[in-house]
């Protein structure tokens, strides 16, 4: 596997590129993105860069899990062709991107500027690497929609593909931030998926308000601080109607408030 740190590297010499951007601390969810990329008969590039522009809290940035040596071994085992691990100088003279109004709901309500930071670094990575296809996990659904729509406007030849969320045996979505939870908190966090599944199983438009309210109450009884539990149109991220494709999203703080899910 090739390892590159310089943005000046000639990525285009490798032909069609399938790109997986990450912030490192890789897990099975990231590896599934790489598996999807390898199915495309392209040269697979994975970037590792902890982007300070998307953190609202300095402590979150400092405490974000880092495991670069282990990450490199995982990338090699997964068949990644090139690891792009830039220094923070990649941010020099960067064009700041303002996210669309779709960033004002869900996570964006409590994390102002977060998605601006995401799109700013993604725009630079796309410009540097010029991939044919880029892969993102659907766990961060709002981020996926924002990036997909941004790419449609500014990188029309780039295909953005979403990969389903990878979960552990309890149903908990795999996340680098899960490393900040102790075993008891991990067990409690499994209740998130259970409540979302109950909403899905019993869903109807005239019951959704009640189902969401009950799920929120159940989780709060366990000690969760629910930032939002919302249901929106899956494409526009606007309020639902009778013909909409619905996405149900939830953001919480664990009973020990050290992690945002």
Features from the language model and the residues they span:
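Conserved small/polar residues in nucleotide/adenosyl-binding loops
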Residues: 252-261
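Nucleotidyltransferase catalytic core that binds NTPs
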Residues: 2-224, 231-236
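A short, glycine/Asx- and small/polar-enriched loop/turn
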Residues: 240-246
